[in-house]
Amino acid sequence: MEKNYYALAYYYFGPVSNPYEEIALHKQLFKTMDVSCRIYISEEGINGQFSGYQPDAERYMAWLKQRPDFASIKFKIHHIEENIFPRVTVKYRKELVALGCSVDTTKQGKHISPEEWHEKLQENRCLVLDVRNNYEWKIGHFENAVLPDIETFREFPDYADRLAKEHDPAKTPVMMYCTGGIRCELYSALLLEKGFKEVYQLDGGVIAYGLKMGTGKWRGKLFVFDDRMAMPIDEADPNVSPIARCSLCNTDSDTYYNCANTDCNNLFICCESCIATHKGCCSEECSQAPRIRAFSAERGNKPFRRKHLCPTIEQSCCLKEQENQPA
């Protein structure tokens, strides 16, 4: 019998009295469930991405909302066909979002609903700022958004300084967005510290916008840090036209792969034809390399984990598994 699964995205910024106890309780609960996840908990809150068999996911949501520290948490839910993380990971992380500097999160931009966001986009009055990494917005973003060429979130504090020099903070209203909302909690506070007076953030991020408004003013797909790699923001509109191009032949494509050359492992966009021709590699040079993972079109573009590296040799070349940057 076919099983239905949920993908959950959620976070909460607020004091957590005993994060290690919460971690232990999570792990104990998950022992009896058909789930996979990547959850970080600290004294400042929780940042979670979760997948699970529907009854188990519903049980977990009800359980978490009964925890005193997490009663106000909001879940964003998508229907999926299987678990989308390699394992259950619940761990302590002091910085829920790796910004690299401290900010006063008690002072944040104004949260606006997906409906309000959609209306403001049509006013064309604000600077619309994408605060995700460049490889994320490359396959999807809002119309007319400013797309910083940033590889990691730790580069955004320097970008904020540049933004304050290029635009008058007192006169430039800013609307910012990220995948699920958590990065905006920090970056909106940072822009306020830089002197920006009118700062808005999309409540629940792009995920919430898609659930409420459909495709709307969004173009392309949404990059996600799980086995799907990318997803349409509207479940009812899965056939989204690519806005990116294959890095090898320049045809339209929005599919990311990790290079099958284990000494490269580069994340790149590729079409079906080129990925087959180059055996899962990002270049002709890599396709001739000595340590190549076996490529299978049936496996699709799921990210490679440690267990997939160098199946015929000692796993001395294991590369660091890409850690999820909070949404």
UniProtKB/Swiss-Prot annotation:
Keyword list (alphabetical) reads: Oxidoreductase, tRNA processing
- Entries under Gene3D superfamilies matching the protein: 3.30.70.100, Rhodanese-like domain (3.40.250.10)
Task: Read off the SMART domains from this record.
Answer: RHOD
Annotated GO biological process:
tRNA modification
| Name of a matching Pfam family | Rhodanese
Which residues are named in the active-site annotation?
Answer: 178
Enumerate the PROSITE patterns for this protein.
RHODANESE_3
Record field: catalytic activity: uridine(34) in tRNA + AH2 + O2 = 5-hydroxyuridine(34) in tRNA + A + H2O
EC supergroup of this enzyme: oxidoreductase
User: Can you provide one Gene Ontology molecular function annotated for this UniProt record?
Assistant: oxidoreductase activity, acting on paired donors, with incorporation or reduction of molecular oxygen
Q: Which InterPro entries does the entry link to?
A: Rhodanese-like_dom, Rhodanese-like_dom_sf, Rhodanese_C, TrhO, TRHO_N
Highest rank taxon of the organism: Bacteria
Q: What is its EC number?
A: 1.14.-.-
Q: Which residues form the Rhodanese domain?
A: 122-218
The similarity comment for this entry is: Belongs to the TrhO family.
Q: What task does this protein carry out?
A: Catalyzes oxygen-dependent 5-hydroxyuridine (ho5U) modification at position 34 in tRNAs.
NCBIfam families referenced in this protein's UniProt entry, alphabetically: PRK00142.1-2, PRK00142.1-3
Q: Which HAMAP family match?
A: TrhO (MF_00469)
Its recorded name reads tRNA uridine(34) hydroxylase
Q: Which organism is it from?
A: Chlamydia trachomatis serovar L2 (strain ATCC VR-902B / DSM 19102 / 434/Bu)
